């Protein structure tokens, strides 16, 4: 059987209606591949409640649909966010915004090693920042403050006090405008890897002899987190999940 092109499959998925997540309170929740695995294992365990099985299926579908819509909105060839991709990299975190028990926005972050051009020395330096890897709010829900709610929650949950220390992967003009409007971030040097790091990213830093960027200790960097807390909560049921930042 001839396989459908991936682009057509993603387009069809983007056109699906986002399912209702009746057990998920409105607000922002954080999910990792480990959380989704724990939820799946709990749903498949003997004696699992039908509601738990329904939650696992609909939550995963929500993530895949919003990821496909993000791809479509950005007009790129690759889906950046999906359940499969979250399971492939256990360090990535997905923040899901729900309103009226339906997913309306996603924000995926993770630490990556990058080589970027320093705006002062013009030389390449090695950095390992927390990166914004995908950010999308459904078109029907834009200009209602949901994007700011989602981004602010992520900053607090990741213990980021200075938004400029994040690196942004291939930001759209709309996202650059969002960052300029809400966080005053504008000046940056174009990078060959298509990540955007703002000039203020380099404030309070030095460069080691080996070319690694060293940042003065501050609460601006994301602190280590444990996915087991979310996984345990997922097994216990959606209502037991820690919905507060951090």
UniProtKB/Swiss-Prot annotation:
GO molecular function: tubulin N-acetyltransferase activity
Keywords, in A-Z order: Acyltransferase, Transferase
GO biological process, any: regulation of microtubule cytoskeleton organization
InterPro entries: Acyl_CoA_acyltransferase, Atat, GNAT_ATAT
Source superkingdom: Eukaryota
List of residues binding acetyl-CoA: 135-148, 172-181
GO cellular component: microtubule
Pfam family, one: Acetyltransf_16
Domain N-acetyltransferase: 21-202
E.C. number(s) listed in UniProt: 2.3.1.108
Site positions (Crucial for catalytic activity): 74
Primary enzyme class: transferase
Catalytic activities: L-lysyl-[alpha-tubulin] + acetyl-CoA = N(6)-acetyl-L-lysyl-[alpha-tubulin] + CoA + H(+)
Family assignment from sequence similarity: Belongs to the acetyltransferase ATAT1 family.
HAMAP family, per the entry: mec17
Function description: Specifically acetylates 'Lys-40' in alpha-tubulin on the lumenal side of microtubules. Promotes microtubule destabilization and accelerates microtubule dynamics; this activity may be independent of acetylation activity. Acetylates alpha-tubulin with a slow enzymatic rate, due to a catalytic site that is not optimized for acetyl transfer. Enters the microtubule through each end and diffuses quickly throughout the lumen of microtubules.
Protein name as annotated: Alpha-tubulin N-acetyltransferase
Organism for this UniProt entry: Leishmania infantum
